[in-house]
């Protein structure tokens, strides 16, 4: 508090300054304050006598006393940050109105210190603190700028304040100060802009204020903090589809700059750059552009790093990029399959496992070459090994992957040989609709067009595990769910159309399955009749039960 004490002392010893002409109440305030300062460890400066003494100096017309009060508040609040009331904030806000840069600097600093406390953040804005802070941001004094922006940055961490700040006129000067030559001002300004990107409405205000070109230009800044704030802000801005479209037309260098930052020596900059690319890759144009900009080598390297947040960011990014059909072969050729399969064992993060499986599923969507590469990389075996013991979210992704793979006739022999049916049957018992439905769909596809060469796998799994294919068909026939009944009937029809006498016998000689088919047929017939009797019934031709009835008739016709 030495600086404060010296400001309170007489300047008679310095011939450059005339003696201070003080009012009686000011002399008393100085005397009391000097006494409080001598015993500062036992004094509460935010109430009673100490606060009255400071307030007296604040309201003085003597600029030296105002400076002393501002400096005192700055130093006191640096050491004692807690919730304060209006009586404490009011004199500091008065000091903000001063035309003196020393008073402005110290008052902004004091307010910024108090703005670390959440309740104070709300009260400062409620008491009209934004307007004078915005004025001080536009000061020609760098120190005043720095403290004013720092205070705004702190205030912007409070959710209720963000919209008020966005609409206060603060964003344009913040964007301007983000280009300051003073690194402290830059950091504070970009940090404040980042704090304004956590809601869609505020992000739009930020875009309208012209902050995006500034943020993009600062991606090449040498300071890691500025890079971090800018990449994170842009990542948040890219969450919104409208903003992504605008970025694609106005910021042609954005992707290449973010790709370069994936190689930053700062892990948190790497992470945010990757997340920004992930958000951009929600759009198909960016999915292609990231690959063209050389993003794949960086991403494949990040998948095997030791920093979990980076791994998550990278696998989430490649998952989005893999959605585009043009990227599938390029991703495989870039060496992603092995690390992606390796991430399936990442038990510490369901999210990483989910993104890895989802990427593998995307890569298998459209090409026999890709599907065979997946199989050769051990993806199916690893999924089969894990699927019954992973969390539900991962299980859902794996079952969806199985459903996609089972659609491909070229892959069916390999899937049979991997004994995938051994895990599909238990998965059809899942209480989760997605897991159950995906697994049933995969099983149904594997029962379609069964060749003589592979009929052994149907026989092997007819009654095991868990009552096997037979049990699956019976449960779904009796489920009461039109979707599941449809899967069961379609599977039975596929088995019968394989034209294999032994497979047909499995169904023809099973009274439970035959009974289930006939019961459904009778039920659907009654439904059909009621619709005939009630011609005004809406959507009678779109009723899924019509399709169920048609399936039962096809099956019964084949069975004779």
UniProtKB/Swiss-Prot annotation:
Localization terms from the record: Vacuole membrane
A Pfam family recorded for this sequence: Arm
ARM repeat spans: 39-76, 77-116, 118-157, 159-198, 200-239, 243-282, 284-323, 325-365, 409-448
One Gene Ontology cellular component annotation held by this UniProt entry: phagophore assembly site
Record-level GO BP terms: Cvt vesicle assembly; establishment of organelle localization; nucleus-vacuole junction assembly; pexophagy; piecemeal microautophagy of the nucleus; protein localization to membrane raft; protein localization to phagophore assembly site; protein-containing complex localization
Gene Ontology molecular function: any one: identical protein binding
The UniProt record lists the keyword Lipoprotein: yes
Signal peptide range: none
Membrane-protein topology: Lipid-anchor
Keywords assigned: Lipoprotein, Membrane, Myristate, Palmitate, Repeat, Vacuole
Lipidated residues (N-myristoyl glycine): 2
Lipid-modified residues, S-palmitoyl cysteine kind: 4-5, 7
Predominant location category: membrane
InterPro entries cross-referenced by the UniProt entry: ARM-like, ARM-type_fold, Armadillo, Vac8
PANTHER family linked: VACUOLAR PROTEIN 8
Record function comment: Functions in both vacuole inheritance and protein targeting from the cytoplasm to vacuole.
Family: Belongs to the beta-catenin family.
Protein name: Vacuolar protein 8
